[in-house]
Amino acid sequence: MKKRIWLGALLAIPVLAVLGYVGYAEAAYYRLEDRLALDVDHQQGDQAQPDTEYTLLSYNVGFLAYSADYSFFMDGGEESRARDPRAVETNGQGVLETVREVSPDYLFMQEVDVDATRSWHIDEVELLTGELADYNRIFAQNYDSPYLFWPLTEPHGASRSGIVTLSRCRVESALRRSLPVETGFSKFLDLDRCYSVSRVPVSNGRELCLYNVHLSAYTTDGSIATEQLAMLLEDMEEEYRSGNYVICGGDFNKDLLGNSGSIFGVSGEAYTWAQPFPEELVPEGISLTAPLDEEHPIPSCRNADKAYDPETSFVLTVDGFLVSDNVEVTGAQVVDTGFAWSDHNPVKLVFRLT
């Protein structure tokens, strides 16, 4: 009888541990309110000007963990954190060097940690923008997770992260919009998805509305990503119909080229998250700009199930832009970094307000 009692007690321990963790995760989970006003740090600069060429760079920096030989457990790889603080610093300096070379007027970044186990509690917002004091800066939080005890050998831990918008032109105000997310257990693995809207006054009395976005990838319900995109496009269309200029840039987690496997030579059939971008959702007056050099195609993203191999890694373009018709696009390209500092290459847009 005593053996049975002891055996029952031993079996109950892991069950209670799991139940306790689920309770902890549920208690810690929350979402930020919709239509949250965002602070504009270093507010400065002039109004934007029509018929002036500007450059926008969008860069998913991958919480500064992804050197070219890094693989991530949620992509089927092995690692769950940056290897050490030095790796975060090295990747951060690589990102900064790329930004300085492009010298954009506007800069969007995604997956920028503020305080996270996975990035050794380094404030990446300060690391990446501290030397860029001549930009207006807007931070929008899209991830504040409870401690994730997986993988067991090196848990991913707790994360607070977000998206960052920088602008040389003056930003009068900024707003955070909450996107639809899953409601099941997957909500603990996905982010508190959002986009930010930064309003830049233009000398002709209109506004340039800059949308920084990072849509869902790890979902069990494929309709969530469609709902997110539909909400974003409805908002953009409303601003365009009001006479404003509208540009959205970021990581859409969709194959913007529609057939990246054919273009880059490695099939994506095994990667169900890499679905074609649903262009049928894009309303009149808004268009998709997917950067592609047809003679020398460069992808914007690699699947991080293994170290990057140019010959065998699945690559695609998920980073790009949605632009209103009153914005003239004069150039768009993927900046080739060889995935040295992130699992993404940055994408660049050159444009004029007409």
Functional labels for PLM-detected ranges:
Residues 219-325:
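Metal-dependent phosphoesterases centered on the DNase I-like endonuclease/exonuclease/phosphatase
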Residues 55-61, 91-121, 166, 198, ...:
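Active-site beta-strand/loop signature of hydrolases that rely on acidic residues for catalysis
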Residues 130-133, 158-174, 284, 312-328, ...:
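Conserved beta strand-loop-helix elements of the APE1-like EEP
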Residues 186-187, 307-312, 336-340:
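Short proline/glycine-enriched turn/loop segments at secondary-structure junctions
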Residues 78-84, 112-114, 179-187, 214-223:
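Surface-exposed cleft-lining segments at the edges of enzyme active sites
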Residues 46-56, 65-68, 159, 163-173, ...:
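Beta-strand-turn-beta hairpins that frame and shape the catalytic cleft
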Residues 5-134, 139-160:
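N-terminal, active-site-proximal structural segment of metallo-dependent hydrolase catalytic domains
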Residues 327-338:
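Low-complexity, intrinsically disordered Gly/Pro/Thr-rich segments
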